[in-house]
Amino acid sequence: MNLNATIFFQMLVFFVLGWFTMKFVWPPLTKAIDERRQKIADGLAAAEKGKADLAQAQARVSLIEASAKSETHARIIEAEKQAASVIEQARREAEAERARIVAQAAQDAAQEVQRAREALRDDVAALAVKGAEQILKREVDARAHAELLNQLKAQL
């Protein structure tokens, strides 16, 4: 029986050690394991949330990019329309200026022709008067008259 008392004390020490471990060692270990498990779960949740936020941000970026593209396209079209309008307006103004210059030149030419005609009439009238004076100063002779008229024709 010595063997029985040893086994009894070993069992008693085992149960005391088990109780001590359950009472003082086991709770901090389970608490640390639970905290670690919670940290891992929180990290995974944060990673999932970050992934979802990234997807939302990428969606917003693609929407903003599409909006910017369409806005840029619209601005380019508007600028082209405005440029065409400015060119067309300049063309109309140039055409009006050309027409005005041509009309002014035609008017100036007509006035110059009119002045030339007036000057020519004055010259013809002066020559006619001069010829009439010469005819009247000389005696009346058909041959002399014809010669004077030929000279007047040559001067005209």
From Swiss-Prot:
Signal peptide feature range: none
Highest taxon, organism lineage: Bacteria
Cell division recorded as keyword: no
Protein localization: Cell inner membrane
Subunit structure: F-type ATPases have 2 components, F(1) - the catalytic core - and F(0) - the membrane proton channel. F(1) has five subunits: alpha(3), beta(3), gamma(1), delta(1), epsilon(1). F(0) has three main subunits: a(1), b(2) and c(10-14). The alpha and beta chains form an alternating ring which encloses part of the gamma chain. F(1) is attached to F(0) by a central stalk formed by the gamma and epsilon chains, while a peripheral stalk is formed by the delta and b chains.
Family: Belongs to the ATPase B chain family.
HAMAP family cross-referenced by the UniProt entry: ATP_synth_b_bprime
Protein name: ATP synthase subunit b
Annotated source species: Bordetella parapertussis (strain 12822 / ATCC BAA-587 / NCTC 13253)
Underlying gene: atpF
